[in-house]
Structures are given as structure tokens and as C-alpha cells.
């Protein structure tokens, strides 16, 4: 079954949006298989955002992601990577569609609440970076048969 990595960034945690964000994925029918609240080390932040290391905003991004608690999650379900991206919305909250997490709750590009893997391959890399295998729990909700044929 397809999996994706989702992180509620420190601004989402500080604003009390964790429950509402999790609810978006649950009501869509995805299964939460990994969840932890944590403070992010500089090493982990730099590995996660390695793709941006040459960008001018890299150091401020690292400082921001370390600035407070973050909720790291792994969600499972059919088409979860692409669907999660739609649920999250455009990177810039000012251009994100209403009805998306960023469109409804986001205020600025630098504080866009949430991260979601952008591809199946990226999801696997990010899951392996943020979670140990024993931290993930595979299970099948009884409602799955009502969601997926």
C-alpha cells in the first residue's frame, strides 16, 4: 500500500491546528501508521531539506523547522501521495485554493504549516529519514472496505 510522509511544522503546532489537519486525512479515508511529536535536530533538518541547501533561504528554513515542536506522520492509502498534495494545497498559502489546508489556514510562504512528500520515491526516502521501521504500525481499519473496492 502506498505511503506518504506528512509533517505539521512548528507554526501549525503552535497555532493549535494539529487535530484539524489530522482530521483532513482521516476523513479522506487514509490510515495513520506513524505519528510522533518532536523537536527537530539541525542534522535532521539539513538532511530533510538538502535539496534547498544552495538556496538563499536555507539557513532560515532550518532555524524555523527547529524553532518548536513538529508533528511527523506517515499516512497510508491508495493514491495517498498525490491526494495528500491536493489536501495540503499550493506551497504559497496566498495562491492555495480555499478548502485546502494552506488555503484555509496558511498566511505566508515562510509559515505554510505543513510538509507533504511530492512523489512516491521521495515519500519513501523521507519516511526512512524520520521513522524507524518499528515506529510504523500496519493495520487495516474496518471502514476500508467502504472506501476502496
Swiss-Prot record:
Give the matching Pfam families.
NDK (PF00334)
The superkingdom listed in its UniProt entry is Bacteria
Keyword DNA repair attributed:
no
Please state where this protein is localized. Answer: Cytoplasm
Q: Name one GO biological process term.
A: UTP biosynthetic process
What this protein needs as a cofactor is: Mg(2+)
Please list the residues that make up the active site. Answer: 115 (pros-phosphohistidine intermediate)
Where along this sequence does the record place binding of ATP?
9, 57, 85, 91, 102, 112
EC number(s) for this protein?
2.7.4.6
Name the InterPro entries on file: NDK-like_dom, NDK-like_dom_sf, Nucleoside_diP_kinase, Nucleoside_diP_kinase_AS
Alphabetical list of SMART domains matching this protein:
NDK (SM00562)
Q: What is its main location?
A: cytoplasm
Query: Which keywords fit this entry according to its UniProt record?
Result: ATP-binding, Cytoplasm, Kinase, Magnesium, Metal-binding, Nucleotide metabolism, Nucleotide-binding, Phosphoprotein, Transferase
User: Which reactions appear under catalytic activity for this entry?
Assistant: a 2'-deoxyribonucleoside 5'-diphosphate + ATP = a 2'-deoxyribonucleoside 5'-triphosphate + ADP; a ribonucleoside 5'-diphosphate + ATP = a ribonucleoside 5'-triphosphate + ADP
Question: What sort of enzyme, by top EC class, is this?
Answer: transferase
Per the database entry, which stretches of residues form a coiled coil? none
Oligomer and partners: Homotetramer.
Physiological role? Major role in the synthesis of nucleoside triphosphates other than ATP. The ATP gamma phosphate is transferred to the NDP beta phosphate via a ping-pong mechanism, using a phosphorylated active-site intermediate.
- Stated name of the protein: Nucleoside diphosphate kinase
Give me the gene this protein comes from.
Answer: ndk
Amino acid at each position: 500500500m502506498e505511503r506518504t510522509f506528512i509533517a505539521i511544522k512548528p507554526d501549525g503546532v503552535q497555532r493549535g491546528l494539529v487535530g484539524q489537519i489530522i482530521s483532513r486525512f482521516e476523513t479522506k479515508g487514509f490510515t495513520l501508521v506513524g505519528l510522533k511529536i518532536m523537536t527537530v535536530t539541525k542534522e535532521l533538518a539539513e538532511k530533510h531539506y538538502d535539496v534547498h541547501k544552495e538556496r538563499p533561504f536555507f539557513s532560515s528554513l532550518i532555524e524555523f523547522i527547529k524553532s518548536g515542536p513538529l508533528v511527523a506522520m506517515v499516512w497510508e492509502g491508495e493514491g495517498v501521495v498525490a491526494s495528500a498534495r491536493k489536501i495540503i494545497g499550493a506551497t504559497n498559502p496566498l495562491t492555495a485554493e480555499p478548502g485546502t489546508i494552506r488555503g484555509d489556514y496558511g498566511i505566508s510562504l515562510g509559515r505554510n504549516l505543513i510538509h507533504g512528500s511530492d512523489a512516491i520515491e521521495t515519500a519513501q526516502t523521507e519516511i526512512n529519514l524520520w521513522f524507524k521501521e518499528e515506529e510504523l504500525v500496519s493495520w487495516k481499519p474496518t471502514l476500508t472496505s467502504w472506501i476502496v473496492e
